Structure formats: structure tokens, C-alpha cells
Swiss-Prot record:
Record carries keyword Nucleotide-binding: no
Keywords: Glycosyltransferase, Golgi apparatus, Membrane, Signal-anchor, Transferase, Transmembrane, Transmembrane helix
Protein name: Hydroxyproline O-arabinosyltransferase NOD3
EC top class named in words: transferase
EC number: 2.4.2.58
PANTHER family: HYDROXYPROLINE O-ARABINOSYLTRANSFERASE RDN1, PEPTIDYL SERINE ALPHA-GALACTOSYLTRANSFERASE
Gene coding for it: NOD3
Organism: Pisum sativum (Garden pea)
Pfam family, one: HPAT
Length: 334
């Protein structure tokens, strides 16, 4: 195990040096230690990290279906699409979805927390892939593009979504293990994860190796691991960004999350991470399996059936729209 760890960190340090060289030579002018950019209208590359598990595959297929529908709509700044497959080998979707295969972390290093592979996957992809666009959207398999997505970022300030449960200030004791006082107040750390985020490619090249390092350090610290749990990697991205002095524009309209967000409106992405449980009167029964339900975790081993029944009257429009979009995708995917 020590040899594996040594090899991994040697590889990580080499990538850091290469990425650091690219950042230093290609970013442009630096004023008072901060990078200054001018272009704000470029397209962004849509990148989603994934595994070869059936659960990940069916979500990616639905996401890619709606990407293709939204890409060329008026107001969209979407460029090309890549599924970054961190299972280390090809799968059966290679010819259906543009895919770039990267290596997972060495055996045992993720300690069962598979999301820890995400920052390492981005480091490898950024170094090895040819990416034409100047910006990148970091997305997830359970994202559906519900409105044309413009480039919400500027070249020196990425755009992110503020998560109500990412609370750096309330976890200052833990945050100081990774964001020391000399770096500034913990309020420098944005209440975000890495997804959804639209970011200039060179800024992500700067952040990504630090994101790997902070993620591994957090997972290795028992207190941090216990307190942050499944959102540990999200905190790691937020801290890594702050360590590089990078602030995100916080866009609540970036994403909605049924069943808590009731209307689609002018938001851009539906994130169906939460289960939607209702009784037949249209009342939410969250925490209790409903008489009607849609929960992605019901389909761990195989995709959802075609033509899922629509929710009963009274259920919010966001949930109805989600089910209709899933149904349209599954009806048109072979």
C-alpha cells in the first residue's frame, strides 16, 4: 500500500508541475497576483464524471439526450460533451456518448467514497484530452438541461450554485485545518461544490491538483470525514478554489432540485438527487415512501421503466416536468 501511495503522489506531483507550467505560460496578464481576462462570450465544454455502473450509465444517457436537445437552442453556449469515465476501462456506451477513459484512484484510496475519484479524473482529463472550448461546465449524471444554458461565468470568476448545506462559517474549526487563518476568513470559501460550475479551463487546471490534495487530506482526517460525510468532496473543491483566491458568482437560477424547488421557471438544470414521494392527494411525504414516487435510487441495477406514471394532481410543476423529461428520453433512447 505504501508503494502504491508513493507512486500515486509522485504521479500527482508530476501532473501538478505540468499543469502549473501551463497555467503560468498561457493565462495571460497577471495584475497584483490576480489573473486578468477579457473574453466573456466563449462556449463551454460539458464534462460529466461517471462510472461504468448501470446506475451511472442510465443517468448519463438521459443527460446526454437532453444535452443534444438543448445544445443548439437560442441562448445556449454549450460546446462539445465528454463523459469522463473513471472506471479505468471502456464500457458499452463508448459509441453512444463521447467518452474519455481515465484511471481511478489506486485500490483502497477512496475508502468506498467513490466520488473521491472525481477530482483525480478531472486532473487526468485536463492534462491528456484536447479541449477546444475555453470554458468547462462540470456537471453530474443526474442533471437534465431544462432551459438553454448560457455561459454564466466570466474569465476571472467562475459561476457556481449555492448549496444550503455547504456551510464553511459554521464549520470553522474543521475548515482551519485546510484553510489556515493567514489565508483569510473562512467566508472566503464559497458555499458550493464542483458541480454545477462553469469555469475557465486554465483556472480549473490551477485548482484541480489542489482539489485532489485537499480531498485526500479531508478523507484521511477522521473528524472531517465524519462531519462532512457524503459532501466532503464538495467542501474540498470550495476550499481548493479559495486557496487559489478564486471566488465564484453564486447563481441560484443555475439549478433546481425537486421536490424542494416547486417551479422550473427560468432555471437551467434539474438536479434529481432527492426522492420525490407523494400521496394520491399530491401531498409530499418526504422520508416516507409515497403512494406515488420517483427516486433515482429505486433503479440502482437497471434503468427506470419507460412511460413512468405521472404524479397525481397537486404535485409541483418541477416534479411533473422531471418525470415528463425522463419519459421522453427513455422513449427515444434505444
Amino acid at each position: 500500500l505504501l508503494m502504491v501511495l508513493g507512486f500515486f503522489f509522485a504521479t500527482y506531483n508530476l501532473v501538478s508541475m505540468i499543469v502549473g507550467h501551463k497555467v503560468g505560460s498561457d493565462l495571460g496578464s497577471i495584475v497584483d497576483g490576480k489573473v486578468e481576462f477579457t473574453n466573456t462570450k466563449s462556449k463551454f465544454h460539458v464534462a460529466v464524471t461517471a462510472t461504468d455502473a448501470a446506475y451511472s450509465q442510465w443517468q448519463c444517457r438521459i443527460m446526454y439526450y437532453w444535452y443534444k436537445k438543448a445544445k443548439d437552442m437560442p441562448g445556449s453556449a454549450m460546446g462539445k460533451f465528454t463523459r469522463i469515465l473513471h472506471s479505468g476501462k471502456e464500457d458499452q456506451l463508448m459509441n453512444e456518448i463521447p467518452t474519455f477513459v481515465v484511471d481511478p484512484l489506486p485500490d483502497g484510496l477512496d475508502r468506498g467514497y467513490i466520488v473521491l475519484n472525481r477530482p483525480w479524473a478531472f486532473v487526468q482529463w485536463l492534462e491528456k484530452a484536447v479541449i477546444d472550448e475555453e470554458y468547462i461546465l462540470m456537471a453530474e449524471p443526474d442533471h437534465i438541461f431544462v432551459n438553454p444554458l448560457p455561459n454564466l461565468a466570466s474569465e476571472n470568476e467562475p459561476a457556481g450554485y449555492p448549496f444550503f448545506y455547504i456551510k464553511p462559517a459554521e464549520n470553522e474549526k474543521i475548515m482551519r485545518k485546510f484553510y489556515p487563518k493567514e489565508k483569510g476568513p473562512v467566508t472566503d470559501v464559497d458555499p458550493i461544490g464542483n458541480s454545477p460550475v462553469i469555469i475557465h479551463k486554465y483556472l480549473l487546471e490551477e485548482i484541480a491538483p489542489t482539489w485532489v490534495n485537499v480531498s485526500l487530506r479531508m478523507k484521511d482526517d477522521p473528524e472531517t470525514d465524519k462531519v462532512f460525510g457524503w459532501v466532503l468532496e464538495m467542501y474540498a473543491y470550495a476550499v481548493a478554489s479559495a486557496l487559489h483566491g478564486i471566488k465564484h458568482t453564486l447563481r441560484k437560477d443555475f439549478m433546481l432540485q425537486p421536490p424542494w424547488d416547486l417551479e422550473v421557471g427560468k432555471t437551467f438544470i434539474i438536479h434529481y438527487t432527492y426522492g420525490c414521494d407523494y400521496n394520491l392527494k399530491g401531498k409530499l411525504t418526504y422520508g416516507k415512501i409515497g403512494e406515488w414516487r420517483f427516486d433515482k435510487r429505486s433503479y440502482l441495477m437497471s434503468p427506470p421503466p419507460k412511460n413512468i406514471s405521472l404524479p397525481p394532481p397537486g404535485v409541483p410543476e418541477s416534479v411533473v416536468r422531471l418525470v415528463k423529461m425522463v419519459n421522453e428520453a427513455t422513449a427515444n433512447i434505444p
